[in-house]
Amino acid sequence: MQKSLKSPEYARLIATLVAVRHAAGVRQQVLAKKLGRPQSFIAKYEGGERRIDVVEFIAIARALGADPVKLFRNYVAGKPVKAGRKGRPG
């Protein structure tokens, strides 16, 4: 498997996280603050300049109010992100 910032699989994973952030109505700055990271951390992984690991994926999902296990299952199954109650992914 290709381990690249530009692989279609990785791009889809990042698109999933971006969609969850948008569905939750959370700006990059707010997410960064929740994670205790600079806004550039969010911009870099969303822009494809930086990879995230599984621990970061879990932290990001939780900071956005999403269940990381469900989110990853849906990603693997190729399901699109849907906005649930209060704009949260569900």
Q: For each of these PLM feature ranges, what is it?
A:
Residues 1-23:
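A short, Lys/Arg-rich alpha-helix, primarily the initiator
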Residues 27, 38-41, 53, 67:
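Short coil turns linking two alpha-helices in DNA-binding domains
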Residues 15-34, 59, 85-88:
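Short basic helix-loop element that most often maps to the first helix and adjoining turn
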Residues 49-61:
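Short, basic-rich loop-to-helix N-cap that marks the start of a DNA-contacting helix
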Residues 2, 8, 62, 70-90:
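Short, charged recognition helix plus adjacent turn
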Residues 38, 49, 75-79:
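The DNA-recognition helices of helix-turn-helix-type DNA-binding domains
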